[in-house]
């Protein structure tokens, strides 16, 4: 999603 999710503390694309 290009940002950080609540369950994932790393940037997602």
UniProtKB/Swiss-Prot annotation:
Dorsal ganglionic sheath of fused ventral nerve cord. The modification Valine amide is found at residue 13. One of its GO terms (cellular component) is extracellular region. It is found in: Secreted. Keywords: Amidation, Neuropeptide, Secreted. It comes from the Eukaryota. GO terms for biological process: neuropeptide signaling pathway. Belongs to the periviscerokinin family. Mediates visceral muscle contractile activity (myotropic activity). This is Periviscerokinin-1. It comes from Sarcophaga bullata.
């Amino acid at each position: 999603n290009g940002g950080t999710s609540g369950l994932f503390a790393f940037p997602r694309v």
